[in-house]
């Protein structure tokens, strides 16, 4: 019996966990298995990368963007199809988001659906404001709060709704028969 003890021997030290070293193709394989970014993050990264690009009315390219053209291309980069105008973008998603629940990637609409931006972080949005300006990140001012109409969170559920609508718009119009007497 050990002095002062209850007759128990000290526990043997645990073996350290084995280490694994990856080389060459193994490293590449692990890198390729990374978790993909969520769609909102891909879209937000796209929009933020376009900061400094000029506003061009009707624009949706590297030459320039209007507000809805920027959102269209940002979410297109994330694999989500949006309609062209701000009003159509707002109407394409049934789930509306209120001001207090805004998150990065949400599309925010202002001025009777005449303008759209994307939440970049709490209290800020990235957007293409108007002629003579550039794509930029900007604080959501009190004026914006007062002009706020609503917001949407583009997601796969909304995409299906928009895809159905788009398919209907592309369907051929029924033939109209006319008779002459």
Residue ranges and their predicted role:
Residues 28-47:
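N-terminal hydrophobic or amphipathic helices/low-complexity stretches enriched
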Residues 1-20, 28-32, 96-97, 120-181:
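Aromatic- and glycine-rich peptidoglycan recognition patches
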Residues 52-56, 110, 156:
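A broad detector of the eukaryotic-type serine/threonine protein kinase catalytic domain
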Residues 80-141:
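...with weaker cross-activation on analogous glycine-rich loops/strands in unrelated enzymes
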Residues 50-103:
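Catalytic cysteine-centered active-site loop
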Residues 20-26, 57, 84:
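A generic structural-conservation signal
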């Amino acid at each position: 019996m050990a002095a002062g003890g209850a007759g128990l021997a000290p526990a043997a030290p645990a073996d350290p966990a084995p280490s694994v070293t990856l080389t060459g193709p193994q490293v590449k394989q692990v890198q390729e298995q990374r978790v993909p970014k969520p769609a909102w993050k891909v879209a937000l990264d796209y929009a933020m990368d376009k900061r400094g690009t000029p506003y061009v009315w009707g624009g949706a390219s590297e030459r320039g963007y209007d507000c809805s053209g920027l959102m269209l291309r940002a979410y297109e980069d994330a694999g989500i199809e949006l309609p062209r105008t701000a009003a159509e973008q707002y109407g394409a998603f049934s789930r509306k988001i209120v001001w207090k629940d805004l998150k990065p990637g949400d599309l925010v609409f202002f001025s009777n659906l005449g303008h759209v931006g994307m939440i970049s972080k709490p209290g800020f949005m990235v957007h293409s404001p108007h002629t003579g300006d550039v794509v930029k990140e900007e604080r959501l001012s009190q004026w914006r709060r007062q002009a706020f109409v609503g917001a949407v969170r583009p997601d796969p559920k909304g995409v299906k709704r928009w895809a159905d609508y788009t398919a209907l718009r592309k369907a051929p119009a029924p033939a109209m028969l006319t008779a002459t007497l």
